[in-house]
Amino acid sequence: MNKVFSLKYSFLAKGFIAVSELARRVSVKGKLKSASSIIISPITIAIVSYAPPSLAATVNADISYQTFRDFAENKGAFIVGASNINIYDKNGVLVGVLDKAPMPDFSSATMNTGTLPPGDHTLYSPQYVVTAKHVNGSDIMSFGHIQNNYTVVGENNHNSLDIKIRRLNKIVTEVAPAEISSVGAVNGAYQEGGRFKAFYRLGGGLQYIKDKNGNLTPVYTNGGFLTGGTISALSSYNNGQMITAPTGDIFNPANGPLANYLNKGDSGSPLFAYDSLDKKWVLVGVLSSGSEHGNNWVVTTQDFLHQQPKHDFDKTISYDSEKGSLQWRYNKNSGVGTLSQESVVWDMHGKKGGDLNAGKNLQFTGNNGEIILHDSIDQGAGYLQFFDNYTVTSLTDQTWTGGGIITEKGVNVLWQVNGVNDDNLHKVGEGTLTVNGKGVNNGGLKVGDGTVILNQRPDDNGHKQAFSSINISSGRATVILSDANQVNPDKISWGYRGGTLDLNGNNVNFTRLQAADYGAIVSNNNKNKSELTLKLQTLNENDISVDVKTYEVFGGHGSPGDLYYVPASNTYFILKSKAYGPFFSDLDNTNVWQNVGHDRDKAIQIVKQQKIGESSQPYMFHGQLNGYMDVNIHPLSGKDVLTLDGSVNLPEGVITKKSGTLIFQGHPVIHAGMTTSAGQSDWENRQFTMDKLRLDAATFHLSRNAHMQGDISAANGSTVILGSSRVFTDKNDGTGNAVSSVEGSSIATTAGDQSYYSGNVLLENHSSLEVRENFTGGIEAYDSSVSVTSQNAIFDHVGSFVNSSLLLEKGAKLTAQSGIFTNNTMKIKENASLTLTGIPSVGKPGYYSPVTSTTEGIHLGERASLSVKNMGYLSSNITAENSAAIINLGDSNATIGKTDSPLFSTLMRGYNAVLQGNIMGPQSSVNMNNALWHSDRNSELKELKANDSQIELGVRGHFAKLRVKELIASNSVFLVHANNSQADQLNVTDKLQGSNNTILVDFFNKAANGTNVTLITAPKGSDENTFKAGTQQIGFSNITPEIRTENTDTATQWVLTGYQSVADARASKIATDFMDSGYKSFLTEVNNLNKRMGDLRDSQGDAGGWARIMNGTGSGESGYRDNYTHVQIGADRKHELNGIDLFTGALLTYTDNNASSQAFSGKTKSLGGGVYASGLFESGAYFDLIGKYLHHDNRYTLNFASLGERSYTSHSLYAGAEIGYRYHMSENTWVEPQMELVYGSVSGKSFNWKDQGMQLSMKDKDYHPLIGRTGVDVGRAFSGDTWKVTVRAGLGYQFDLLANGETVLQDASGKKHFKGEKDSRMLMNVGTNVEVKDNMRFGLELEKSAFGRYNIDNSINANFRYYF
């Protein structure tokens, strides 16, 4: 392109035309009646003679055009980092996979370049872009979104190649620069099989679609947009400075699945390559020329691209910490300044007149540097780059403006300088900028990388403002608030890809949320919790400033709602689209423009009212809420609806919504050039995690593609809809324009698009919950209602419904693993199903903990299903009326539904499932597998299938009937109750089938022979062997009913005629073992009875107090085990008599004894006291006497004969005497034979109860044990000047002289008497006594017994005595 003509984009010709430089600033004077009245001069001739194909980018017609657009803008499936992307043709056939590299980031290409097409410049450094040298015509360009405008202030053309560098007025904050290949211009560097594995391009020239027959179809671009695709491996020419690809054959697989070729309209657009060595995408070229035969790129080399920036730097400033602060002075008239440190002076250059490019960049090194501004600095386009920590301050409120600040990684710059009105401080770089100025800073901030800490200081009047506005973009930056008053929160916005606002433990109140996309983050990373308050409000006129733009004759881009002025007609128009055509061609198109007349003030007022109207629409926030904070959402002005389609990650946070509506939803996938809509099929999932969502008179929707984890508390008429179809979309989504919400309805059509909820819901005070999609958790409802339509609802926590309804709608499926409790009747509608199970074991697949569910009743609709299995226990009556419902009890799979807990196994009585309640379902079926059903009232069924199960009818005082048309039973038990004239009855009317079934009979009074009671009635001719009489243990006997079969004219009947009763030795043994447990407690006390007197013989002293603690365990027959802790305290006194030392004393005792066996477990607590005397003769003989009384509190649980838990009291008396003689073998060694006799009195106990209708009793009378013991102890004493230690060991034999009472057991078969048995055992002990002072003694003894039916396994006895 020469200097006389420039390429201009023609909206009329839908392409570029050559336009004289003299026409660049065309203005139309005079009053225009309409756009059609304009005469276009010679430019029109150029348009007419223009040949479209010569300026085209052409793509494959077999693939959706949208795919090429999404590719170029990183939208749809082509998000940054995506891999293995499938490419489909228009018929849905897979035509290729982008699997050679992850998807690159194309955001470094321009989104808008004035009248030039997008994508013709590429940012490769924070302030520099590269393009083709022949690309001219616009100095304005934007990145990320078209609103983010930058101005070209300088450029550098290559002297021989078609490439140039352009400098921008500011550092770009919205996007990250593209990385430049380090390979550069090397012949063959980009050929197939080399280091670079994939080549992608994009551009915004005129677009064409080409079919396999070579036919071209133009695509109307409405202002230009980007497309992109794959390029084949490249060959080099011109000494490697140029690369080319034969891309004309776009149907050749060698060119990739998204092959396309470019022409002049895409000049300057970038070519990216994936460097397999460095594992990254790099910029390798810019388009210079092309045709259908191939494209040619100028290789982007680091040498050239770094050439111009080097010219834009003044000398690097190196701070010397020994020379004081750097003094910065500046002359705004000359645009020249200095930074000096003592005698060292560095020159700097700033804006000169209107020339921003005169401003040079400055680099700073030297750690902990200090800079003081003596003058306000206007550095033009020059920026500051810090490689070390610095403090920058002003002498007297001087300001700084320029291209921006770069802080390198690990660097912290303390910035104490304010900015100026209408200027933004641009900040990038991974390091930190700490803003610490004073007073009110009128400048704004745009940050795109690293960290900015806002710590502005107040002025003398207490006023402070870190910035007038803040924009966070590119997704790489974080702004941290040191306090809540650093900036007006409503002046914070998040631009392209957003960034993080860290509340830093502060409480912040927003009335506006300005977030462009999902990259916007509000977080708190401080250990102190923050509160984010949203009091969102509609705009008011004072908040709105309207910029009146001048209409560009050659067309252009804008944002819907922008106000334009057409001077030729003195008319104001509001733009309704994102672009407009040239030469006033579409001013009459009401889809593009709204004519608002000739009055400027009125036009501005209309714009304001439109913006206010849009802001009153339901609110949306596309961003993220993260960290340690609560969110409080107040009633919102306008329409009180807030939709979050970003994400929430507040594991310890509470979100509160008062009135209005809150919606969590997924996000519709953004496609290039398309407005998102509720009706589109592709949505992105979003995660919402919080501790709790609290609703007060509010409505909450969890809509499609939203996954929520956290509890919900809903009160005061709140409504919760989990799986809602209500959604909102933003018609400006992906454009950077203000949110404009649109309400819609969208139902997920795949499981992956459905909502998922995990948590517990609390409903109070007339609130409601609708579970429509995936639910895992629990529900507590009080005076509220719950309905389920989901086919995947799981209660893994308790479901409790107090004065509340639970309704399963048509087709719903609910599984409750932790029980359901309600005082209302549950309703299960047509084709709905409810499954009740136990709690699955985490570590043992197939194992469950039993869980009980209790309801007032369950009503089943047509073809509804109720299943109780895998340790599920249901207590409820069930009605199905005339519905053909199905009830499944138990599970036949032997590998699941088990429990390894004996307690739980007893609850379930060994079955997989239990139902307690009657069923009224004349048209319904019940299937039982390894299940127990107890119908205590009448039940009626169409069909009953039972396998390895048990059916129990009736309850004491009430006989029940089970009426069933068809009964198919195998290996099952039917238990009925009977007296001598009546019984529960099973009535089979149509069909009886099965085998190996057992009839058990519980009786309500003493069984009598000669009865004649019908138990089962079946159709005539039924197999008499279907049932047989079974034996069951009742009380202490095995009872077998006598049943005969009778055939009548109409039926076969099983008739009860009597019983056979045989004593059950095992049951009797269990009972007597329990009754005998009192003796074992008595024996424990006996063994501890005379310990104190034995101590006296080893440590004679005067009067004193003592304490003793003993702990031991014992075991006996039938699995009996006990462990006890015994405590004694007492005092005694020595009386010296003639030839004898007599000790007398008193003691108090407490024993905590835990005992268990295979059939019982419990605790006995004993409290008592006694007196004792011990006489020690000078000859060595001694005697011991003791008497003691104990009161016992007993509580035991017995799992035999339905006895259950029993609490009772008892008491015992002890009288003991021991004599012995201590023979001294030497002065310190002795042997002591001894003999002891203990007589006692133990109170009896009595129990009366019923087991399966049988009256039982179990009692023993008071009895009087007499226990003897003989033995011998040996001991030796060791002593020093102030201490004495005595050690001893003993061996003895303990035996019963009298039998231990009598136990009487009584059941329907009569009384059974069991005499107590004598027992004996060997005793062994070792011990020691230590005298550490004249008045203190310590003792320790270990004891064990053997060879008895009951033995002490181990016992340890520790004592302490203090002499007065």
UniProtKB/Swiss-Prot annotation:
GO CC annotations, alphabetized: cell outer membrane; cell surface; extracellular region; periplasmic space
Ranges for domain Peptidase S6: 57-307
Single Gene Ontology MF annotation: serine-type endopeptidase activity
Alphabetic keyword roster: Cell outer membrane, Hydrolase, Membrane, Periplasm, Plasmid, Protease, Secreted, Serine protease, Signal, Transmembrane, Transmembrane beta strand, Virulence, Zymogen
EC number assigned by the record: 3.4.21.-
Autotransporter domain boundaries: 1098-1364
Post-translational modification remark: Cleaved to release the mature protein from the outer membrane.
SUPFAM superfamilies xrefs: Autotransporter, Pectin lyase-like, Trypsin-like serine proteases
Record: active site: H134, D162, S267
Annotated site residues (Cleavage) in this chain: D1098, S1099
A GO BP entry: proteolysis
Control of this protein's activity: Inhibited by phenylmethylsulfonyl fluoride.
UniProt keyword Methyltransferase present: no
Cross-referenced Pfam families: Autotransporter, Beta-sol_PIC_HAP1_IgA0_2nd, Peptidase_S6
Signal peptide: 1-56
Effect of H134R: Loss of activity
Entry function: Autotransporter serine protease probably involved in virulence.
Entry comment, domain topic: The signal peptide, cleaved at the inner membrane, guides the autotransporter protein to the periplasmic space. Then, insertion of the C-terminal translocator domain in the outer membrane forms a hydrophilic pore for the translocation of the passenger domain to the bacterial cell surface, with subsequent cleavage.
PANTHER family found in the cross-reference section: ADHESION AND PENETRATION PROTEIN AUTOTRANSPORTER (PTHR12338:SF10), AUTOTRANSPORTER (PTHR12338)
Other noteworthy facts: Leads to accelerated virulence in the rabbit ileal loop model of infection. Nevertheless, the relationship between the enzymatic and potential virulence functions is uncertain.
NCBIfam families: autotrans_barl
Protein name stated in the entry: Serine protease EatA
Organism: Escherichia coli O78:H11 (strain H10407 / ETEC)
Taxonomic path: Bacteria, Pseudomonadati, Pseudomonadota, Gammaproteobacteria, Enterobacterales
Gene symbol of the encoding locus: eatA
